[in-house]
Curated annotation (Swiss-Prot):
Residues 29-115 form the PNT domain. PANTHER family: ETS (PTHR11849), ETS HOMOLOGOUS FACTOR (PTHR11849:SF171). Pfam families: Ets, SAM_PNT. Residues 207-289 bind DNA. It comes from Mus musculus. The lineage of its organism: Eukaryota, Metazoa, Chordata, Craniata, Vertebrata. This is ETS homologous factor. Residues 185-195 have a biased composition (Basic and acidic residues). The gene is Ehf. Highly expressed in kidney and lung, weakly in skeletal muscle, heart, and liver, and not detected in brain, spleen or testis. It is found in: Nucleus.
Length: 300
């Protein structure tokens, strides 16, 4: 892959990518490019140096911030490194992710050339809006007539039987604010003095479903009788009050119609990412996978 400003490829390990940082690393002034190989968060380093896990974290971030259904982005199509990801064209993103491909491609291009270490700065500069077509009753009626599941608490369609149709209907990009023509003084000031990211081993108020489950297990005094450890050393746990957990998650996500059936369906999304595992033959029993963090007793 040819990088801007690089005329000769140097194969000497002593002068490799850790010493020859391309021009786009200027957008990450407080970041150590090499730290991508040692567990740093995805927004702290340039996408070129993401691990496969950091690619997945980026995809999860887009799902969460844009309130997309998990089926909109097929994670199995992105079991790749950051270098591979950065080499993909818009057409390749579209083939891999369908209607979500444009969102992923546009988001990645912004990160590559205008990225900041702080995810908050990134979100303010790159405004991706996902909206529903609820203003057109005929569209909503068509979805209902075709037996798609409609969740009024979200004001949008969720858990559609045809996820591809759902994603095509849901994803709407705002292009006017993606790449500003001229930088304002405030934006320039933010780029010159980026907000430092303070990372922790785990966030006690995790925004992901698996983190929410983990945090209940880690705080049994605050959430008694909901979930219990079956084998803490192996990361195995059981739902005691599955519907109560679902209602708590629904409250967190402003979805009053959340049920355990929907919750368990969302949990399956973490299987391929090896964050959660289903324990065969045991109802309501799950296990944290090798990519889940913050649940072990010896983790700080």
């Amino acid at each position: 892959m040819i990088l801007e400003g690089s005329g000769v490829m140097n194969l000497n390990p002593a002068n490799n990518l850790l010493h020859q940082q391309p021009a786009w690393t200027d957008s990450y002034p407080t970041c150590n490019v090499s730290s991508g190989f040692f567990g740093s968060q995805w927004h702290e380093i340039h996408p070129q140096y993401w691990t496969k896990y950091q690619v997945w974290e980026w995809l999860q971030h887009l799902l969460d911030t844009n309130q997309l259904d998990a089926s909109c982005i097929p994670f199995q199509e992105f079991d790749i490194s950051g270098e591979h990801l950065c080499s993909m064209s818009l057409q390749e993103f579209t083939r891999a992710a369908g209607s979500a491909g444009q969102l992923l491609y546009s988001n990645l291009q912004h990160l590559k050339w205008n990225g900041q270490c702080s995810s908050d700065l990134f979100q303010s500069a790159h405004n991706v809006i996902v909206k529903t077509e609820q203003t057109d009753p005929s569209i909503m009626n068509t979805w209902k007539e075709e037996n798609y599941l409609y969740d009024p608490s979200y004001g949008s369609t969720v858990d559609l039987l045809d996820s591809k149709t759902f994603c095509r209907a849901q994803i709407s990009m705002t292009t006017s604010s993606h790449l500003p023509v001229a930088e304002s003084p405030d934006m320039k000031k933010e780029q010159d003095h980026p907000v430092k990211s303070h990372t922790k081993k785990h966030n006690p108020r995790g925004t992901h479903l698996w983190e929410f489950i983990r945090d209940i297990l880690l705080s049994p005094d605050k959430n008694p009788g909901l979930i219990k450890w079956e084998d803490r050393s192996e990361g195995i746990f059981r739902f005691l009050k599955s519907e109560a957990v679902a209602q708590l998650w629904g409250k967190k996500k402003n979805n009053s119609s959340m049920t355990y059936e929907k919750l368990s369906r969302a949990m399956r999304y973490y299987y391929k990412r090896e964050i959660l595992e289903r324990v065969d033959g045991r109802r309501l029993v799950y296990k944290f996978g090798k990519n889940a963090r913050g649940w072990r007793e010896n983790e700080n």
